[in-house]
Amino acid sequence: MSFRNIHYFLLLIVIAVPLGKYLYVAFFEKGKIDRFFSPIEAVIYRLSGIRSLEEMTWKSYCTALLIVNAALLGISYGLLRIQHYLPLNGAKVENMEPTLTFNTVVSFMTNTNLQ
């Protein structure tokens, strides 16, 4: 084991307990910042139609996941198809052809490494 690895493990051991205590407080106890952000969060939830105290079933979670993935797939496909017309395209990259665009977007969505 190298000197760098030993230092890394020692650092992990030293910060494990303080970091664990901090995370416990951050997730399970009300803090000062919650008084500021809770009303803002409530407004965002109300406008979005989210019921924050209601847990999702597996069916509603799966539906939400599929809807978000479909939306991201559409947005990504659209961006890659019109990239030539977008501002800040300094390299003047041309639009991708449809099948290559679809392949690229699906590989991003599924985290596929096509090498």
UniProtKB/Swiss-Prot annotation:
Covalent S-S links between cysteines: none
Purpose: Part of the high-affinity ATP-driven potassium transport (or Kdp) system, which catalyzes the hydrolysis of ATP coupled with the electrogenic transport of potassium into the cytoplasm. This subunit binds the extracellular potassium ions and delivers the ions to the membrane domain of KdpB through an intramembrane tunnel.
Keyword entries, A-Z: Cell membrane, Ion transport, Membrane, Potassium, Potassium transport, Transmembrane, Transmembrane helix, Transport
Keyword NAD belongs to the record: no
Subunit structure: The system is composed of three essential subunits: KdpA, KdpB and KdpC.
Gene Ontology molecular function: P-type potassium transmembrane transporter activity
Keyword field contains Transport: yes
Pfam families, A to Z: KdpA (PF03814)
Membrane topology qualifier: Multi-pass membrane protein
Signal peptide range in chain numbering: none
Protein name stated in the entry: Potassium-transporting ATPase potassium-binding subunit
An annotated GO cellular component: plasma membrane
Record-linked InterPro entries: KdpA
Transmembrane segments: 8-28, 60-80
Localization, UniProt: Cell membrane
Family: Belongs to the KdpA family.
